[in-house]
């Protein structure tokens, strides 16, 4: 983080996965304590304090839906029950065998865990509650905690509201209309084609439908990849008036600021690109996206217009962009 600041990155938000003893996607909802091998609570506080000294924000990854059999307090009575009385389970993620925690109980675990984090002097700025906004609402038929899908969404929102009440900015995987009142930002909200192979056919013309409704309500970070022989994803970040990802994938090459010349040059270029997107986001982040056009009917030339008059035009033929503020370039 210090190296990135030295390179001119400006204010950053550090999202940390796998920070607790069980490891990433393991042991939820009994995720604490902080990983001993990484310095434990003392080391975690030191990291958070170092971020704050530089004016940066710090947030954690957490999870209150996947319910791992290896969790310290695992009790099958707390799990979702399907209409036929069975308990769903799979072993897809790193933590192995799991079911789903009934959301009626999730707020209790959130209160317990975040209260414990605070007792160690760790002042979280943000928290990412994984999967809540990318999975449909669960139904539960357990007689002790029956739940409809609407009630599931209400309990998930209660988790977000608890964090907000304690000064912690809320985040989850994607964006959903039910979560808008209690969600500050998300992991991402990519177009469908951005989740597929670059050579895969696209299922239509990508347009910012969600942002035409909710742009001023939820901050959306955008991928900044430049696809060889394809699109520069930075253009979609600009069209949507979003925030940029500087580093999205964990990597060991730059650990402890030890960057070789090639990596440093690439990072410097990434910082310059992110500065453009971040600058626009500072201007329009709280503005409504009021219009989006295919310029001249050409789907590869798109323009977004924000409530303050800022217009962003992206030409995907040439992979270029133009930002005009109230008619001036």
Language-model segments: residues:
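Aromatic-lined carbohydrate-binding/catalytic grooves of carbohydrate-active enzymes
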Residues: 1-112, 120-127, 131-145
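Active-site-proximal substrate-binding groove within the catalytic cores of carbohydrate-active enzymes
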Residues: 71, 79-94, 101-127, 131-329
